[in-house]
Amino acid sequence: MRTTIALPALTTSLLALALLATPAAGAAPPALADCGPGELCLWRDAEFKGERQTYDLTGTDIESCVALPKGTTAQALANRTGRPVTAYQSEHCAETGEFQTYPGDGTWTPRSPYRVRAFKIWEH
């Protein structure tokens, strides 16, 4: 007796297996899970690598310039504070250097165009 497998059924099964084995397009690297709701996380290196610093509203004054510790910079950041955050190239939040504001609704920036040395969290 000869067994016949329907090609469409086999194709569908193989496609389903391939989709299960492939990570979701928007899946975040494991390091991103370390930045919790209400936090601003800054990583020393691009792509969320290296030492991570975490700030939240309990220890950070709104609309005040917060310099990173002396000699420390960040090249990746995640803003989950719920408020806009401006990242500055200048350690004094001077607008003569590069700066950019990131929305607070879950912004993930794997590679800043400059080394971040300070930030401000805004009211809204």
Regions found by a protein language model. Give the residues of each.
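Compact beta-sheet-dominated domain cores in extracellular/mature segments
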Residues: R2-H124
